[in-house]
């Protein structure tokens, strides 16, 4: 018999938010350490860490009154956090797109007189697809004028799709860099320097 898989960090965060949304109540840490394992399957030892991560991300509010800390969260709070996350993803998207376009210009110059339109066409299609997804995310945001507990799952899914889209662009940039190095002898350090690609440029976790 296979061993039951434990909850991921994201699943724990989602279930913790469900406690707040379903009860619309204010809790102390000790209360959540009792409720979370029983109702949501979150181990009591991980409650504090998960709760703090939600506070750090602006999903849960916290206030110290006397000697005790109190925690609460409402759907409208999640909506604002989602807006900030979307803005962050859009900024990352714009930055990646600009770097991609700069690299594409470099490759286009190097390909003068060469027939290599298939790869270029694929990159153009990917750009159109990602632009369309960005428009969908913005339109989806408008639908959440009134939130309900389902917003937690919606936030997780939308952010995952947007993050995957940005990471696909990161894949494209790495692919173009690799292609340029192999075909034209460009050095990676030179490409990064010429087009302002930071040393820590990488995928979004």
Curated annotation (Swiss-Prot):
Q: Which GO terms describe its biological process?
A: reciprocal meiotic recombination
Q: Does the record's keyword annotation contain Nucleotide-binding?
A: no
Keywords in alphabetical order:
Coiled coil, DNA recombination, Meiosis, Nucleus
Report the main location listed first in the record: nucleus
Please indicate which superkingdom the organism of origin belongs to. Eukaryota
One of the entry's Gene Ontology molecular-function terms is: double-stranded DNA binding
**What Gene Ontology cellular-component terms does the record carry?**
nucleus
Presence of the UniProt keyword Nucleus in the record: yes
Subcellular location, record wording: Nucleus
Question: Which Pfam families does the UniProt entry name for this protein?
Answer: LZ3wCH, Mnd1
Please list the coiled coil stretches. Answer: 79-147
Q: Which InterPro entries does the UniProt record give?
A: LZ3wCH (IPR040661), Mnd1 (IPR005647), Mnd1_HTH (IPR040453)
What's the family? Belongs to the MND1 family.
- Record PANTHER family: MEIOTIC NUCLEAR DIVISION PROTEIN 1 HOMOLOG
What task does this protein carry out? Required for proper homologous chromosome pairing and efficient cross-over and intragenic recombination during meiosis. Stimulates both dmc1- and rad51-mediated homologous strand assimilation, which is required for the resolution of meiotic double-strand breaks.
Q: What is this protein called?
A: Meiotic nuclear division protein 1 homolog
């Amino acid at each position: 018999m296979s061993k039951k898989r434990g909850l991921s960090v994201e699943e724990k965060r989602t279930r913790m938010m469900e406690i707040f949304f379903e009860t619309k109540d204010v809790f102390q840490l000790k209360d959540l350490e009792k409720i979370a394992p029983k109702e949501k399957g979150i181990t009591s030892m991980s409650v504090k860490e998960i709760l703090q991560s939600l506070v750090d991300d602006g999903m849960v509010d916290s206030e110290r009154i006397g000697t005790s800390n109190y925690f609460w969260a409402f759907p409208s709070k999640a909506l604002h956090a989602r807006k900030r996350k979307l803005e962050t993803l859009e900024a990352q998207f714009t930055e990646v797109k600009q770097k991609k376009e700069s690299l594409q210009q470099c490759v286009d110059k190097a390909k003068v007189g060469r027939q290599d339109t298939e790869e270029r066409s694929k990159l153009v299609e990917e750009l159109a697809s990602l632009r369309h997804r960005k428009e969908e995310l913005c339109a989806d945001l408008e639908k959440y004028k009134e939130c309900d507990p389902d917003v937690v799952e919606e936030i997780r899914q939308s952010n995952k799709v947007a993050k995957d889209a940005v990471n696909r662009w990161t894949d494209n940039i790495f692919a173009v860099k690799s292609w340029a190095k192999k075909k034209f002898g460009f050095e990676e350090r030179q490409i990064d320097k010429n087009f302002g690609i930071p040393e820590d440029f990488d995928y979004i976790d």
